[in-house]
Amino acid sequence: MSFKTIVGLEIHVQLMTKTKAFCSCRADVFDLPPNTAICPVCTGQPGALPTVNSTMIDYAIKIALALNCNIHEYSRFDRKNYFYPDLPKGYQITQYFYPIATSGYMDIDVDGQTKRIRIRRLHIEEDAGKLIHEGDSITQAQYSLVDMNRCGVPLVEIVTEPDLSSPKEARIFVEKLRSILRYLEVSSGDMEKGALRCDANISIYDESAHLQSNRVEVKNMNSFRFIEKALEYEQQRIIEALKNNEDVEKETRGWDIATKMTVSMRGKEEESDYRYFPEPDIPPVIVPVERIEEIKRSLVELPDEKIERFVSVYGIPKYDATVLAMNKEIADFYEACVREIDKPKEISNWIMTEMLREMKSLESENITITPAHLCELFRLMEKGEISMKIAKEVFPTVFRTGKMPGEIIKERGLKQISDENLLENIVKKVLEDNPKAVEQYKSGKTGVIGFFVGQVMKETKGAANPQVVNKIIKQILG
């Protein structure tokens, strides 16, 4: 039996505007006490009228341009009607009939191959509140609390076509999207804070039986890893059902972190269930072509453009350029270092290994040092004052404390010995102590030189400059 996985994504992006979508309440509500950033508009009190946040429109256009969408001069808001405890109005203001943008795409790199993922639509809407479930899980909660602070926070929803064919591709797509959002500075993209939320629709096509399963929606995937894990689980669950000739329910399921399984939440709603109709209190949004062009001119260099430039200007492999460019802070750090130290590949290697390792161990996406720290480390190696081994040894302390490398090296007495007169005496002693190895070298077994270097390093407790030691040995032995 042969199966094909079909995945489409619905991604909600929380915009970093100062105020909410349709009122003047602050939009950055993550750390606020419950129900302290609300007003009659965002809680749907009778007689309260919404006004459109123009920055929200500009941010949506920026995202649409970055995703190669067609932007419509005319768009309109609608009401999506449903009942849920975190939706005090009983409806959500969204764009259903006339979204601000459609027909875009984003290219992703999968195992060295470029794959184009089409984007069906991009529309603006307001967020709902947040339910806090007290108990074991959403299905076992004894009771739930409602925080209305998030009501009315501006969102952009991005809906892809079902072009993704694996859980891995879904993860890669969301990772790259977050990178673009951060470059544009329109969203923090912090999944753990709910600023980027991904729902997936997955179905499986049985190629031997020419049968496609019902579509299942998967929610509660609040990290890149969980996107991949949840979809892997759901993919296997549906395949097993098809193998056993069992029905696959059309439903919404949630990823349970504790059990590492998806659990049924509710039946899958149809669009007709929401009874969409035009929002009567908000006029249509008219975006002149001139405004779109002005926003387009203001766009920064995006990841794909930066990758191309890094490859052509600095001559580093595309893989390196991609790793560096996916994080704007890392890309800027790299360029600042290369401007000072003309070693683009060496600096790229250092960032991708030593620095990313430290960031991972600290579970941080932030760089805690300046380019000056890394440049000083490279200059010390260039001068022969420290070896690569010592540089790697002190770097974790540099990264975690912010101290300059030279200061740490001085404190620990790690400065490399490059004095040829001093090293010559040590080399002579090593050669005198190992006459058999000297004879082997003279008989043509030049590989033994590594043994001599090792003995000198042992004598100096790793402080000798190995290049200088190597040169002295060859001079003495001829």
From Swiss-Prot:
<dbReference type="InterPro" id="IPR018027">
    <property type="entry name" value="Asn/Gln_amidotransferase"/>
</dbReference>
<dbReference type="Pfam" id="PF02637">
    <property type="entry name" value="GatB_Yqey"/>
</dbReference>
<keyword id="KW-0436">Ligase</keyword>
<protein>
    <recommendedName>
        <fullName>Aspartyl/glutamyl-tRNA(Asn/Gln) amidotransferase subunit B</fullName>
        <ecNumber>6.3.5.-</ecNumber>
    </recommendedName>
</protein>
<dbReference type="InterPro" id="IPR003789">
    <property type="entry name" value="Asn/Gln_tRNA_amidoTrase-B-like"/>
</dbReference>
<dbReference type="InterPro" id="IPR014746">
    <property type="entry name" value="Gln_synth/guanido_kin_cat_dom"/>
</dbReference>
<dbReference type="GO" id="GO:0005524">
    <property type="term" value="F:ATP binding"/>
</dbReference>
<dbReference type="GO" id="GO:0006412">
    <property type="term" value="P:translation"/>
</dbReference>
<keyword id="KW-0067">ATP-binding</keyword>
<dbReference type="Pfam" id="PF02934">
    <property type="entry name" value="GatB_N"/>
</dbReference>
<dbReference type="InterPro" id="IPR023168">
    <property type="entry name" value="GatB_Yqey_C_2"/>
</dbReference>
<keyword id="KW-0547">Nucleotide-binding</keyword>
<dbReference type="InterPro" id="IPR017958">
    <property type="entry name" value="Gln-tRNA_amidoTrfase_suB_CS"/>
</dbReference>
<dbReference type="InterPro" id="IPR004413">
    <property type="entry name" value="GatB"/>
</dbReference>
<dbReference type="GO" id="GO:0070681">
    <property type="term" value="P:glutaminyl-tRNAGln biosynthesis via transamidation"/>
</dbReference>
<comment type="subunit">
    <text>Heterotrimer of A, B and C subunits.</text>
</comment>
<dbReference type="InterPro" id="IPR017959">
    <property type="entry name" value="Asn/Gln-tRNA_amidoTrfase_suB/E"/>
</dbReference>
<keyword id="KW-0648">Protein biosynthesis</keyword>
<dbReference type="GO" id="GO:0050567">
    <property type="term" value="F:glutaminyl-tRNA synthase (glutamine-hydrolyzing) activity"/>
</dbReference>
<comment type="similarity">
    <text>Belongs to the GatB/GatE family. GatB subfamily.</text>
</comment>
<dbReference type="InterPro" id="IPR042114">
    <property type="entry name" value="GatB_C_1"/>
</dbReference>
<comment type="function">
    <text>Allows the formation of correctly charged Asn-tRNA(Asn) or Gln-tRNA(Gln) through the transamidation of misacylated Asp-tRNA(Asn) or Glu-tRNA(Gln) in organisms which lack either or both of asparaginyl-tRNA or glutaminyl-tRNA synthetases. The reaction takes place in the presence of glutamine and ATP through an activated phospho-Asp-tRNA(Asn) or phospho-Glu-tRNA(Gln).</text>
</comment>
<dbReference type="InterPro" id="IPR006075">
    <property type="entry name" value="Asn/Gln-tRNA_Trfase_suB/E_cat"/>
</dbReference>
<dbReference type="GO" id="GO:0050566">
    <property type="term" value="F:asparaginyl-tRNA synthase (glutamine-hydrolyzing) activity"/>
</dbReference>
